[in-house]
A protein has these predicted regions:
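A detector for small-residue-rich transmembrane helices and their helix-helix packing motifs
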Residues: 2-197
Length: 197
């Protein structure tokens, strides 16, 4: 392992551990305050709720909700962050905003949506598509591993489970795919398409 690879690996691990740790701290605060943070979820088509799109991605409705999201976020987040901390943060922001806007526009009224699952679906989409966009064989292979490990989550974009925001999942996935193109190494205007490597 080269020093650069070791640095990227360590940075990715630190980032995702801090990110997930923050989710647990926020849930502890929510629990200790009688769920005072729950209103910061997304209430569809209310103008003042647009400001809650980002914080909603860091909040959960109970420990079971958070625990269900913790492992996939750790795994997919670490894989995505290996490309670089800056890239991960851009991908996360794009995904969270697209997912949140999708929920705000399409979710039923009344409802309240929060949780990291939109980001998880976004990271899934990003990791699967990224290798094809950048024509990197190693990333295509990584995307294949992601499909094997977490491909079954795609059922979550269908409206089959009451109380689960399929809208957040679907638009999170779309946001992740968008992020793969927007953060591509070949995104600069006039830059030739990358060759496979």
């Amino acid at each position: 392992m080269t020093s650069e690879t070791a640095y990227r690996t360590t940075s990715a691990l630190k980032l995702i551990l801090v990110w997930v740790g923050l989710l647990w701290v926020l849930e502890a605060v929510d629990y200790a305050t009688g769920h005072a943070l729950d209103p910061f979820g997304i209430a569809p088509r209310q103008a003042d709720e647009l400001l809650d799109i980002v914080p909603a991605a860091f909040l959960h409705f109970g420990w079971d909700h958070l625990m269900a999201n913790t492992v996939p976020l750790l795994v997919l987040g670490f894989m995505a962050a290996l490309r670089g901390v800056g890239t991960f943060l851009v991908v996360a922001l794009i995904t969270i905003v697209v997912s949140g806007l999708g929920v705000w526009i399409t979710a039923p009224v009344p409802s309240n949506t929060a949780g990291a699952s939109g980001l998880i679906f976004g990271l899934f989409g990003y990791l699967v598509v990224r290798g094809f966009v950048d024509r990197r064989i190693a990333d295509v292979a990584l995307g294949g591993v992601v499909v094997v490990l977490y491909g079954s989550i795609l059922w979550g974009v269908l409206p089959t489970t009451p109380g689960v925001s399929w809208q957040g999942h679907l638009f999170g996935l779309i946001g992740g795919v968008m992020a793969a193109f927007m953060t591509s190494h070949a995104r600069a205007k006039g830059e030739p398409k990358p060759t496979w490597h």
